[in-house]
Amino acid sequence: MPKVGIIFNDDKPTACSVAQELQEQLQQSGFTVAMETGSGGLLGYSQPDRPICHTRIEHLTPPHFDESMPFAIVLGGDGTVLSAFRQLAPLGIPLLTINTGHMGFLTEIYLNQLPTAIEQLINGDYQIESRSMMTVRLMREENLLWEALSLNEMVLHREPLTSMCHFEIQVGYHASVDIAADGIIVSTPTGSTAYSLSAGGPVVTPDVPVFQLAPICPHSLASRALVFSDLEPVTIFPATPNRMVLVVDGNGGCYVLPEDRVHLSKSPYPAKFIRLQTPEFFRILREKLGWGLPHIAKPTSVELP
């Protein structure tokens, strides 16, 4: 029998109950179903007085999931989707993402669309959209201390109650630049609608092969977001005496010391989204973030006295 998977947010009763119902439905349709919670993809935070908690990228793959799976289903919000791709992107499994959370910017459908969606899924009536991911590595001399896959962004910022930071940043083999700021964000196109957007970065459509660097509260009028090819690796050298905090996808990370460096590159593992209709990014921007909506109602759209 073909094998498929379900990853769900076990902190949400709705996701748990729907996961159980889906498991039974898929088993009745002739599938073997592997179940896993989204917590398996959580990175966790390293404490400053303890050794760095390092889990290799390939070691996040849950048991009983493998490359033979034609698809897996994710039940949760955006955090669960990010966690699921950290777990399954190395296996190349396409994911149908179902929103049981709040905004669900990365999810494909809502629960009320589930019956039709499962029918399409079983019949193979869908497209696959591939989105680039980023590999984040923390190096000390030549030693790998920590690594993670990122679908959204890497953030390197100062600790609370410390002063502004300086960063030496080298993109590809170009001359390095110095940025003075509270922190920096390096994001994928998918992450351009997340933290980077709040920091003043532009929205980048998912099909554009770029990375984006955005400073957080820079101390210069000349420091602005930069968009560059994702074929260019990025190396960040902390040029400040204080330790910093590295966070990936708002989920977890570790402390970065002045002698460390952060290396970013395009991941060989894409995130494969199952699309039940033709992807329309601008519709999602309008629906989820209110992009392009009029600020003032037009006379023809309101009832005039």
Swiss-Prot record:
Key words of the record: ATP-binding, Cytoplasm, Kinase, NAD, NADP, Nucleotide-binding, Transferase
Concerning what turns on (or off) its expression, the entry says:
Expression decreases after transfer to photoheterotrophic conditions.
Active-site feature positions: 78 (proton acceptor)
InterPro entries in the cross-refs: ATP-NAD_kinase_N, ATP-NAD_kinase_PpnK-typ_C, NAD/diacylglycerol_kinase_sf, NADK
Residues annotated as transmembrane? none
Give the location in the cell.
Answer: Cytoplasm
Please give the cofactor(s) recorded in the UniProt entry for this protein.
Answer: a divalent metal cation
- Write down the EC number: 2.7.1.23
Q: Which GO terms describe its biological process?
A: NAD metabolic process; NADP biosynthetic process
| MF terms (GO), sorted A to Z | ATP binding; metal ion binding; NAD binding; NAD+ kinase activity
Reply yes or no: does the keyword NADP apply. yes
GO CC annotations, alphabetized? cytoplasm
Deleted gene: phenotype: Insertion mutant shows a slight decrease in NADK activity compared to the wild-type. Under photoheterotrophic conditions, mutation does not affect growth rate. Under photoautotrophic conditions, the growth curves of the wild-type parent and the mutant do not show any differences, but mutant shows large differences in NAD(P)(H) levels along with massive changes in metabolite profile. Mutant exhibits a fast-growth phenotype under light-activated heterotrophic growth conditions and light and dark cycle conditions in the presence of glucose.
Q: Out of the domains of life, which is the source?
A: Bacteria
State one Pfam family annotation: NAD_kinase_C
Top-level EC class as recorded in UniProt: transferase
Function in brief = Involved in the regulation of the intracellular balance of NAD and NADP, and is a key enzyme in the biosynthesis of NADP. Catalyzes specifically the phosphorylation on 2'-hydroxyl of the adenosine moiety of NAD to yield NADP. Functions as a growth repressor under light-activated heterotrophic growth conditions and light and dark cycle conditions in the presence of glucose. NADP(H)/NAD(H) maintenance by slr0400 probably plays a significant role in modulating glycolysis and the TCA cycle to repress the growth rate and maintain the photosynthetic capacity.
NCBIfam families the UniProt entry points to: PRK02649.1 (NF002732)
Recorded family membership? Belongs to the NAD kinase family.
A further note on this protein reads: NADK activity derived from sll1415 makes probably a larger contribution to total cellular NADK activity than activity derived from slr0400. Slr0400 cannot functionally replace sll1415 under photoheterotrophic conditions.
Q: What is this protein called?
A: NAD kinase 2
Q: Which organism is it from?
A: Synechocystis sp. (strain ATCC 27184 / PCC 6803 / Kazusa)
